[in-house]
Amino acid sequence: MKPTTIASLQKCKQDKKRFATITAYDYSFAKLFAEEGLNVMLVGDSLGMTVQGHDSTLPVTVADIAYHTAAVRRGAPNCLLLADLPFMAYATPEQAFENAATVMRAGANMVKIEGGEWLVETVQMLTERAVPVCGHLGLTPQSVNIFGGYKVQGRGDEAGDRLLSDALALEAAGAQLLVLECVPVELAKRITEALAIPVIGIGAGNVTDGQILVMHDAFGITGGHIPKFAKNFLAETGDIRAAVRQYMAEVESGVYPGEEHSFH
């Protein structure tokens, strides 16, 4: 199978072809996703909640991310694999580079970091040293204590303009992908159209170039609060492989996310 690359996603944006991505944390699910053609995966620090049982992503370490990245890479050798740099792993550009090197050696193709213009120097340093970067704006879970909970971001002209400015700054610094989480559809559309790089949404409506879901949300195996943007594809299909295919098909056709999964 031909490897999926950042250039593959860039072509999807140019061709206006939506694409699906998903979180993965282990060999078996990564292998299954790849076999069904879902070839863009993120080893997210969401594993702190979905795998480790914490109430936030904050306890996750670089070693945790590297461990799960290696497992996913063994299951999906040709996927485009993103890996989060967890909380306090990129406080300085030098620290970011050291920790990015660790997860890249474990098998990641790209690192994802949360934050806006304050990360410009870090993004520049990483890209200059051959570490591709995916930005993450909107609801950034590592900042949950600043936000006062998991809340929609970017509402209102001032907040929206600030997120757009952050997105443009990250792109100019060298970021090659951007995740937008829990922002109004109207803002997601502005940002997606303003950027040349692909934008992946989660809780950002169906106007972004791609979508991502935490796999536990996609299969309805998350306990407690269910995010508005989540959809249980397993409930509709009764089979994990069929659920993966359904998720991909609905993203590619624009059916998912629907209005009921979106914010304004």
UniProtKB/Swiss-Prot annotation:
Keywords: Cytoplasm, Magnesium, Metal-binding, Pantothenate biosynthesis, Transferase. It catalyses: 3-methyl-2-oxobutanoate + (6R)-5,10-methylene-5,6,7,8-tetrahydrofolate + H2O = 2-dehydropantoate + (6S)-5,6,7,8-tetrahydrofolate. 3-methyl-2-oxobutanoate binds at D45, S46, D84, K112. Pfam families: Pantoate_transf (PF02548). GO terms for cellular component: cytoplasm. GO terms for molecular function: 3-methyl-2-oxobutanoate hydroxymethyltransferase activity; magnesium ion binding. Pathway: Cofactor biosynthesis; (R)-pantothenate biosynthesis; (R)-pantoate from 3-methyl-2-oxobutanoate: step 1/2. It is an enzyme of class 2 (transferase). Its cofactor is Mg(2+). It is found in: Cytoplasm. Its EC number is 2.1.2.11. Belongs to the PanB family. NCBIfam families: panB (TIGR00222), PRK00311.1 (NF001452). This is 3-methyl-2-oxobutanoate hydroxymethyltransferase. It comes from Escherichia coli O1:K1 / APEC. The lineage of its organism: Bacteria, Pseudomonadati, Pseudomonadota, Gammaproteobacteria, Enterobacterales.
